[in-house]
Regions:
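Conserved catalytic core of the tyrosine transesterase superfamily
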Residues: 1-256
Length: 256
């Protein structure tokens, strides 16, 4: 899977699908029939509160296992699919974003939220930023191995740069870590990159403090970035590039 360019997250999801199939029958998946595999998928779909995206990833994982690992075509038939509901994100206004950021008293997390909103970053992209990714001379941030394993550059605004420098001076430079200076900007207690779970938890707390009732997690800041840029007259293709979407179709589906 690594040779095919699959991310570690995708690999884990695919492997988990095979493990679940094994545990369901308590038998080697290589010896299961086509009918048994379909029965497992139907059981999963009807007996578990599983998200459509998770279920469909399970199908892709099993197809990969049988077709590319075992070299069998037994899953070439149509498998039961779970239709993904088309839900539009609940967009935050610029004033709501400002309230959330102001409610975040911890400078590390406030800096993270400013970056996610200001550059349209995915949470994992912000969490894994390194010093070498920040180019103050060109006012850009290098996003390495984003979703789909693709690099891209995003805009580093003066406000973002100022906030980053303040955070580095007051917090990051004093942090106790054995890491090299070129490593992660935002570190957790272990000295590794801060976890996306902790970012999500602080965001929920800040949103509550700000009195924001709209649904959605920290990814809403990225959605707000794209929507506000479009409303300000930014070109759709430019937004697509900044977001790192593989196709402009994805951008249109959410923001047009």
């Amino acid at each position: 899977m690594t040779l095919r360019g699959f991310s570690l997250g995708t690999q884990n999801l695919y492997l988990r699908s095979v493990v679940k199939l094994h545990d369901h029958f308590n038998r080697n998946p290589a010896h299961l029939t086509e009918a048994e595999i379909k029965a497992f998928l139907c059981f999963t779909l009807s007996n578990n509160p599983i998200a459509a995206s998770t279920y469909n990833i399970m199908i892709h994982g099993l197809k990969f296992f049988y077709e590319h690992v075992l070299n069998k075509k037994m899953l070439a038939i149509e498998l039961p699919r779970h239709k993904e509901p088309q839900k539009l994100p609940d967009i935050l206004s610029s004033s709501e974003v400002e309230r959330i950021i102001k409610a975040t008293k911890n400078l590390k997390y406030r800096t993270l939220f400013i970056l996610i909103y200001g550059a349209g970053l995915r949470v994992a992209e912000a969490a894994s930023l390194c010093i070498r990714d920040i180019d103050s001379e060109r006012s850009s941030i290098h996003i390495r191995q984003g979703k789909g394993g693709k690099d891209r550059y995003v805009i580093l605004s003066p406000v973002m740069l100022k906030t980053l420098r303040l955070y580095w001076k007051q917090c990051r430079s004093k942090a106790s870590t054995q890491k090299r200076p070129t490593d992660f900007i935002f570190i957790g207690r272990t000295g590794e990159a801060i976890s996306t779970a902790s970012i999500a938890a602080i965001y929920r707390h800040s949103k509550k403090l700000a009195g924001i009732k709209k649904q959605g997690g920290v990814h809403a800041l990225r959605h707000a970035f794209a929507t506000h840029a479009l409303e300000a007259g930014a070109d759709l293709y430019v937004i697509k590039q900044l977001l790192g979407h593989a196709s402009v179709t994805s951008t249109v589906r959410y923001y047009v």
